[in-house]
């Protein structure tokens, strides 16, 4: 019997099954069964329910071992978010705690379970609360693309799952002969997808460890990093430099943190400076090119974000994709594709 219920009714959306994981032939894992108005975790006896797998494929792309399983208020459990990370589970909480029943049920899966409190210092790493002690660093698949994941890292474990569909589109929009710039690149996931599409990439981040991690992700996917560009420093200063040099790109990705301070102490706030960032990037865009503009700033509404971006690129076409289907809760991610008409 499941221990997590909504309004007293058990739900069969989830079951513990086998999933994609590099270096482990058949790890047990939590997979989506089907989207429903109520939420629960099912017992392991459903592991051989093949119908569950077929319905799961309609939501999660093939060869994907990382996705959101329970999405807070969207699944009737405000403040609790459960992510599958290959054969590990990450439970994030905001303004609440994991109940004893849920923790017990997570322990019963036999998988390593990690807990991260989102209201605490975002640089703190998750804490393992259950399951066997497996390596904290491992490789996981997303849409057939390999990424290094690190459960001991603070801020994030190496990839933002809510950008999965955007990464796929970046790959589709990239082609041999194209140049793609990924600013605020973190571990270079967008860059890897663009390179797999055939583009030459420039990966830009303020932190050298992130650029080193990005190089590892290229290698994991059979891409020689020496054929790509990596730039350390402030994105705004690099964009100004590219514009002065006349260096342009067919695609540019802008996904800055909500707040940051560069190595000179200059502050960047999305709600105040995003439009200026887009205007800088426009000067580096090839005619007919595209930009992906995103932000998870909760202080900024979708319409305000759209107006801010539109003012920076008058006459350009702006479109917005839906959130991935496993993110059914708060529509927090501001996102716009910009196409040079």
PLM region spans:
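Conserved SAM-binding motif I beta-strand of class I
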Residues: 200-205
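Conserved SAM-binding loop of SAM-dependent methyltransferases across substrates and taxa
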Residues: 187-199
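Non-catalytic accessory regions of SAM-dependent methyltransferases
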Residues: 1-86
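Conserved class I S-adenosyl-L-methionine
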Residues: 177-183
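C-terminal catalytic and target-recognition region of SAM-dependent MTase-like enzymes
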Residues: 14, 290-341
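Non-catalytic substrate-recognition/targeting regions of SAM-dependent transferases
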Residues: 75-76, 83, 99-161, 168
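S-adenosylmethionine
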Residues: 235-238, 242-311
